[in-house]
Amino acid sequence: MYQIPVKNLTKLRRPRKRVKSILCDIGMQQCQDMLETYKCFDAGDASFDNTEWDDFTDGHVGKKKKKYPYRSQSLCCSLCWYSSRSVPTFRSHIHRCHWKNLDGACLLMCPYCPFVSSPKVTEQHIQFFHMLPSRAHQSHPSHTLAHTPKTISVTVSADAADDRYTCATCGYHDSLLYVMKKHVLVNHFATLLDRYFGLGSESAPMAGPQIRDGTPVKYHCKLCKLPAETIEHLLYHILSSEKHKELHWQIMPCIIEKECMNQMVGLQNLLNLAPKSMQPVTLFARPNYMPQQTQQTNGNGTVLLAGPSNAAALFCSPGAGQMFLSPQTQALLSGTTVAALQNAPHPQSPGGMSQVLPTSPVVKPLNMVMPNMPQNTPKTLPLTMTVPRLPPPQQGPQVLLPPGVQVNLPGEMGVHSPFLVTQGLQLNQSVPRAPLITSQSVRFIPTGNKVNGVPTYTLAPVQVTVPVHGGPPQMVLAQNQISQPPNSAVVTPGLMPPVQRAMNKNSRPNELAVQAPFLKKHDNQTVKCLRCKILLTEQGIFQHLLHGLKCLFCPQMFYSFKQIMEHSKKEHSLKVKDNRLYIKEQFSLDCDDEGNLIFSTFNLNTDVPKDLLDNRELNLALVTSTKDKIYIKMYPDKAEYTTMLKSAPNACPFCQVKLQNPEDYELHLQTKHHIVPTIHAILKTPAYKCIYCFGVYTEKSTPKTISIHVQRCRCAPKAVKEAERKLNPDTSESHDGDVCSSVQMPASEVTFQGAPEFPKPKKEAVTPRNRRRNTKASKTGTLVPETPVTLVLEPMGMERTSFEDRKDFLSQYFHRKPYVTKTEIELLASRLWINKADVKAHFNSKLTKCLKAIQKKRVCVRLGFKMIEVNKLKHNLFIPEVKPVKRKDPNEVNLSSLVPGVTVKTEQVDATTQHPLFIPEVPVTIKKEEEVCEIDHGFIIQEVTVKQEEVDEMEDALCTNG
């Protein structure tokens, strides 16, 4: 812990075991040298035996502390031999095996360096090496996996109500988890991002210049060396890849979900249209806004508040005679007009008439119809307010409030929610000091825009009851029927843009031209998705556009219509002549002089949720990889694009069990099916994920496929696996890995209630080329019948053994049959529950080792024969049986071996006796000629029969040698 953090720790861990063994050898050698040095001072064993001393090992049990072998992984369990590189895998191991001692097995990773230790030690390590003096007082919620921030930002705005996630450090909020993770990683974990983010220049010296599609790669991932064309690609890979799953658990502590935000100050007071009378008005604003001074009602005067510094609203108070002008309004008016507005007297009419608010003609007028009611009778009048939508460059809201009304206005950032105004509106009836009573809660509608990452909202239509006195039988308050009082301040209409121009600009559809390389145009009404390999319909095409839209001018990819529209307007505006010429030459897209795309016709018309299209129509021109153009007209639908489950189903889609509430539904899925409902990260469709390994199932999974996955899941507990094997035994014969493929089933059995249902895609058109291909495939299928495959070794019961045992079985199978067919590999993979790629790689590695060994080593084969078996063969060869010769002492002279024993006739004895080389010691047997037999002796020639003629020749030879 007290060592300075070292970089390139992965390279140091590889030779660490070897270095440790070398140091042990060096230490042993030093001990031996020291023993030799002091050997002369040794008094002997007698002195050692006669020495007495106290045993210092008293109390030692004799058991040595268990020392685990060296583990090269970064996360090592201190309670057993287990080690892992992935944080989720290590966490699941602790929960499965050491759930009774979680505190002792808990580890914590340093967010700045690869240091890993217990939480207390890691906190000290961070304070010693990574804590800057200027940031010593700040809290670090990213240092622990289960840390809850002590202080929460109290600056809450109305747009945070629909956002599910909030940053615990800076208060940034969004409804998408990916956006929040990206924000935390880029803004609060810059050091951690540097471990993954790499430029193309950094990877060039290591792996050479990386070139992809003819262009050099700009970015890459430092850990897995994945190249990326843009920063968005690299960030998406870092945050969503399973290889970097440990990054998720370091970022999530900085993200607070909506359930954790219920204690934030001001969340329950987002907007209150009916406060109690005679109460001070409070204003909750963001840090860059200061709370304004509040006023109470005096008589029948109107209580109005000064808005934020950037709100384009004109407020007046008749009782106090004060008027507040926003900076934007002051900029539009001259200096004399501003002084006249601020200093002008505002007398109150006897009948309780409110002051006239001259407003901008940007907003539609408000028509109020007063029903007929008796005189002097307080009644409630339902008042429906419709909120029009303003584009960002237009002026902000202007508010007219009748006397006796108090409003709490939350401060907002950027584009503000437009409130109801009318041009020169007067209320000629007397209004008592009674509060407004809202008949329903306030609801916000997202506009689709974001300012500094903060989404903007507008008010939904609200019904309120206004206590008024009776008046004429029917009174219609409209713009053309309202007269202005003589002492009212009126803004010159020439200073404001015309209403018609603003309405035309707001109602004009957006235009966009992008590349969609994954689409293929079949005809004018048919489009095929090459990635999903299906034909697309009009209603479901926008789901496939989320695969990624590429800019026409740069290689950036986008996964949202709003993002690519904003990028195109800022970076590649078609108002520039060069950009118009470029798309006309490269993609044959026509534009007018103002930079608007020309759409002569549309191939497809579809409805898209309005929160995806900025609540405006979109004319989309898609350019495919073959430069074909697809023109689509997109209409904003009323239904919002749901990013989360709005209504949980009350029946399980797998076992049809009726449930009462969403909590029981999720608990049932977790306990019985081991899954939880989720949303697909890219397609934004309902899906399920495993509670052990977080793997996402397709929406057409069955209970059988889920059970098989749980049996093979490496993160699932053993008890759960055994229970699933008993309930649903795996009898399938074709699996492609640990996660089995989902079986197709009707969509009605799995889809959620309330989820969008899309019509089935059309069948692919049959062309002559496809027909020839199909007929050719059918012919080949009939000519080649499938033959049953027999395995050399039967893997009976091996699928439930360990992975090493199954590899040993594959090695034995290789020794029996090194060259296997494709069908054998598939059968072995299905029988052993191993991936086909792993089986094939195992056989290839074994074969490669054998071939290399044959090339390097010279093999000598010695052939031997069994003589017993050879003698049984029938042949014409004569193979004599030779007895082995006994070796004798060379110093001992055996005379019998010099001259062999000779058998002669009786009449030849005298002649033999007179021979000069006759040796008397040689035994001579004299027998009759008919009784002459063979005599054995120790000479090399074992059996000799000598005739008289041969004896004479022998004598001559002996004489010659002598």
UniProtKB/Swiss-Prot annotation:
Molecular-function GO term, any one: zinc ion binding
Broad class of where this protein is predominantly found: nucleus
Subcellular location: Nucleus
DNA-binding region range list: 795-854
KW Zinc-finger (keyword) present: yes
Positions of the UniProt region annotated as Disordered: 753-781
GO CC annotations on file: nucleus
The entry's keywords: DNA-binding, Homeobox, Metal-binding, Nucleus, Repeat, Transcription, Transcription regulation, Zinc, Zinc-finger
Zinc finger (C2H2-type): 75-98, 108-130, 165-188, 219-244, 527-547, 549-572, 650-673, 688-712
GO term, biological process aspect, one: erythrocyte maturation
Disruption phenotype annotation: Morpholino knockdown has no effect on overall morphology, and at the onset of blood circulation at 24 hours post-fertilization (hpf), blood cells are present, however between 33 and 48 hpf, blood cells are absent, and embryos develop cardiac edema. Hemoglobin undetectable. Some embryos recovered blood circulation at day 4 after knockdown, whereas others became severely edematous at day 4-5 and died by about 7 days. At 28 and 48 hpf, expression of band3 almost abolished; embryonic alpha-globin1 also significantly reduced at 28 hpf.
PROSITE patterns: ZINC_FINGER_C2H2_1
Protein function: May be involved in transcriptional regulation. Required for progression through late erythroid differentiation. May be involved in vasculogenesis.
The protein's name: Activity-dependent neuroprotective protein 2a
Organism: Danio rerio (Zebrafish)
